[in-house]
Amino acid sequence: YILLILIQRFIRGLNMKKFTTTLAALLIMGSASSFADGHKVKVGMITTLSGGGSGLGIDVRDGFMLAVKGNKNISVITKDDQRKPDIAVQLADKMIQSDKVDVLTGIIWSNLAMAVVPATVNQGKFYLSPNAGPSKLAGKGCHKNYFNVAWQNDNLHEAAGGYANSAGFKNSFILAPNYPAGKDALTGYKRYFKGSLAGEIYTKLGQKDYAAEIAQIRASGADSVFFFLPGGMGIG
């Protein structure tokens, strides 16, 4: 629905005030299958399709393509960011400047989102985030053209911190990868957890061997462990 709303807004040139007043009507309509001027909306999907974390990107791509299947008013350009911020920036620049996309989407990793989203929205393009939700893009850092259709990174982990309290845990060992989403995760947990920390570790992004960290956890005396290890990093 959010994509359809943005498409309607783009086509009709709605200002923000008019957009907000017609939002409910657009949701009820639930369809943007016909456009008066025949404009075909271009969507640029930059996501991780190879290497570590590609499973998440593939799922996002497949789900998105299923949602727009059969819609002749939407064209989608899909590219692999290889989980590299510099590649993501290059792809976004090309899609905006050369391909003339109207909407960008697809990024999984928050460090890539921080590299791409600000420049995208500041050029008047819409960005729909299907996964990455850096806290720096919320609140005072939010932009009217940025829509996070997943979550803000720290929200889920705040709930985990609250649960740890209700479960009676007093001494947590916490760890996450050293990148924006990892930092948001542990910040969110600590925001609501009222106990003490037996340890706090930021691992390398993409790391899969945690023998050293497990040894530290065993020696720490922690009564609980909270970790955020997305994608392939959490399998092993």
Regions found by a protein language model. Give the residues of each.
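Beta-alpha junction/loop-to-helix N-cap segments that form part of ligand/metal-binding clefts
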Residues: 38-40, 55-62, 70-137, 149, ...
